[in-house]
Amino acid sequence: MSERKFFGTDGIRGKVGSGQMTPELALKLGWAAGRVLSRSGTKKVIIGKDTRISGYMFESALEAGLSAAGLNVMLMGPMPTPAVAYLTRTFRAEAGVVISASHNPYYDNGIKFFSTDGSKLDDNLELEIEAELEKPLECVESHLLGKVSRIEDARGRYIEYCKGNFPADQTLTGLKIVVDCAHGATYHIAPAVFRELGAEVIAIGDKPNGVNINDKVGATSMAKICETVLTEGADLGIALDGDGDRIMMVNSRGEVIDGDQILYILACDAKARGVLRGGVVGTLMSNLGLDLALQALDIPFARSKVGDRYVMELLKELDWRIGGENSGHILNLDHGTTGDGIVAGILVLAAMRRQNATLEQLTAPMEMLPQVLVNVRFEGEHDPLSSDKVKAAQAQVESELGARGRVLLRKSGTEPLIRVMVEGDDHNTVLAHANLIADAVKSAS
């Protein structure tokens, strides 16, 4: 496969106004994508965005480029990423476009595409779009220009879709839930979903102003929701990220429930109902406690590279349905084509209702093992991981940890860093082991 110049593993992303994230590139990208997508299908594209102030600028640029290529554009306004995937499917659009940088600060933004079935755009189509980007922009004749319309009921459609994932014979009546929307795309969606299902909802992070997305709130900043759950005496908390494709939860004691624990809940519930197909896909960073807890239930577990794209690839390869990352990207292919924080939360709440259990009770059988991550900077072209000294240190630690421990060494994809991760039963022991390997890496670099 050819090297991609613009598209990364999750579309195009960067600081607004520099590099690739400029209005000029967005316009040209819209045109190039339009040229590729107009070769077949409905010639209809949906655009959604999160709440960043730059979203308006990029939306206008993409809209102009797509129209210049002859495609009709349907605007959703601020909507979660999984909502774009869902409505792309239901409108039979040729593609969906999301303008978002997910959990990044407001001064970053990104553009990614969904195919007509709501899945990430095929690599080959991305390469075709990149090839068109190299060509001069040529507008279609005036009578062939695309038209632009707005999906006025996008919010209501997606709210009903989310609620449809909860058992029809159950409600959330009696539950007090704190919902943190990260001042992002779910601010006008998530609180309504859980309220309409019967819960008492305390919403935080629900007042976006264009520059406060993910600012000390949301799934990557859990302190505020943990505090709010305790002060409000809530049963649990649900924290979403800026574009709504990631979830973290909080139990009534104010303790964080991460993506690994959510996967455990969903797998146990699916097995109890006899609907678990195969096993569960995690990543190289998934806690060993998840692996061991699933083993105890005879549920297979497989690890992919880090990134929800790779989780999806392995799910499809194994023909399994449930997978995700400890960071909160949760995939359940029986309930959607992409990570969806609101739907994942609904599925956990459904498990609680079916089993008449609290979040604490559902996670109790899974023991999260202490995990230490040490980053070691190195210089030069030499790969420290090929050093005999590093290999010997790793072998020594793995031998001492045995079956209830794990070592992972990997290079950062963006910086000259070696990431040393060690898991085991005792935090102090794990920390000592991680430092032992880190020292070996330093001496080898």
From Swiss-Prot:
Checking CDD domains in the record gives:
GlmM (cd05802)
Reactions accelerated catalytically: alpha-D-glucosamine 1-phosphate = D-glucosamine 6-phosphate
Q: Which Gene3D superfamilies match?
A: Alpha-D-Glucose-1,6-Bisphosphate, subunit A, domain 3, Alpha-D-phosphohexomutase, C-terminal domain
Give, as one word, the top-level EC class: isomerase
One Pfam family this sequence matches = PGM_PMM_II
* E.C. no: 5.4.2.10
SUPFAM superfamilies, sorted: Phosphoglucomutase, C-terminal domain (SSF55957), Phosphoglucomutase, first 3 domains (SSF53738)
Instruction: Cite a GO CC annotation.
Output: cytosol
Q: Which residues carry this modification: Phosphoserine?
A: 102
Q: How is it modified after translation?
A: Activated by phosphorylation.
* GO molecular function terms listed in the Swiss-Prot or TrEMBL record: magnesium ion binding; phosphoglucosamine mutase activity; phosphomannomutase activity
At which positions is Mg(2+) bound?
102, 241, 243, 245
Q: Does the keyword Cell membrane apply?
A: no
Domain of life where this protein originates: Bacteria
As to how many cofactors bind and how, the note says:
Binds 1 Mg(2+) ion per subunit.
Q: Which GO terms describe its biological process?
A: carbohydrate metabolic process; peptidoglycan biosynthetic process; UDP-N-acetylglucosamine biosynthetic process
Matches recorded under InterPro entries:
A-D-PHexomutase_a/b/a-I, A-D-PHexomutase_a/b/a-I/II/III, A-D-PHexomutase_a/b/a-II, A-D-PHexomutase_a/b/a-III, A-D-PHexomutase_C, A-D-PHexomutase_C_sf, A-D-PHexomutase_CS, Alpha-D-phosphohexomutase_SF
Essential cofactor(s): Mg(2+)
Q: Which residues form the active site?
A: 102 (phosphoserine intermediate)
Tell me which UniProt keywords the record has, alphabetically: Isomerase, Magnesium, Metal-binding, Phosphoprotein
Q: Which family does it belong to?
A: Belongs to the phosphohexose mutase family.
UniProt protein name:
Phosphoglucosamine mutase
Lineage, please?
Bacteria, Pseudomonadati, Pseudomonadota, Gammaproteobacteria, Alteromonadales
